[in-house]
């Protein structure tokens, strides 16, 4: 009898916790519905670009990425149209001292900018010397409502020009630290999808396809097993398909997509990819490895009022510990700068950068980064890139 009563009490506690989570998300849904429309950068007299250098190799590669951005936007910076503003307070040491993943004053400084470019942040893991804080990246995305993670993958010699749209807030991650430990034997985590959340990421993918001459969107789910959440995501994509003549939806399962992404016959003709949060996190990393590694890939986190651009690799502790931080590959963060430059209205300058990077990393390769002392430093590679530009 005592065991049964214990279980009943555990159920009541779990239901109470679950109820709180549901009530919070009803409020979040209403906030999404009431949110203002997308910011038009053409109407802004002044654009502030916030810079968050990050941890580990972050400050080293950010210095080089800023050199490239300042060169490409030299006229805009000189005229006062564009301002680069470094935001302090986000090193792991500073965050650990306050035991805050995202200090309030840092968030306010971020909100005072129009777009952000960030290096990698440490997210503490078990065994690290830091407090067990939640991901600062996730908190930034939610606070600024950066619902679309957009990751381009280009492999020109294979005819690959892909763009991935990953839902950036919901799914398994939104309640990632709010699971319920029902009792010693049972733990429950959650996967969340809201209709407004699904609609805005799906529309972002379709709008991109329409504006860039793309004819298909591949929706990647596990809807054959995860019937409600993944099923509703897929239904939302098909409903929007009717609004975009000339753009068709292709369905793929996430396990097949991850297994066959390097199979050119399987991916033939694919252009734009649309994925829920967790699947997008995994598949885009696989695609980045196919492109040449995480050091070559960038991510754009897009919302209606703010946008954040970043490298998708980690902090490079190994390089720092072996006094090789200056040999880190800056290409991922330089590409992120290019995406930022396009987002604020200078797509032609981004294309100039993409072409120069192709020359420097694929065709000419006069200066090569190996991340070891037998290769070029980040500064030497950036000198080469600027000469090419």
Q: Which stretches of residues belong to each language-model region?
A:
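Glycine-rich phosphate/diphosphate-binding loop of Rossmann-like nucleotide-binding domains
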Residues: 50-66, 71-73, 182-256
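N-terminal glycine-rich phosphate/adenylate-binding segment common to multiple enzyme folds
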Residues: 93-183, 187-188, 278-280
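Glycine-rich phosphate/nucleotide-binding loop
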Residues: 20, 262-364
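N-terminal phosphate-binding or glycine-rich loops at protein starts, especially the Walker A/P-loop
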Residues: 11-85
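N-terminal beta-loop-helix "entrance" segment that forms/cooperates
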Residues: 78-103, 259
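Glycine-rich phosphate/pyrophosphate-binding loop and the adjoining helix
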Residues: 18-21, 25-28, 32-33, 175-178, ...
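Buried hydrophobic positions in well-ordered alpha/beta secondary-structure cores of metabolic enzymes
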Residues: 55-58, 114, 165, 205, ...
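Active-site rim loops that border cofactor/substrate pockets in soluble metabolic enzymes
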Residues: 88-92, 229-273, 277-281
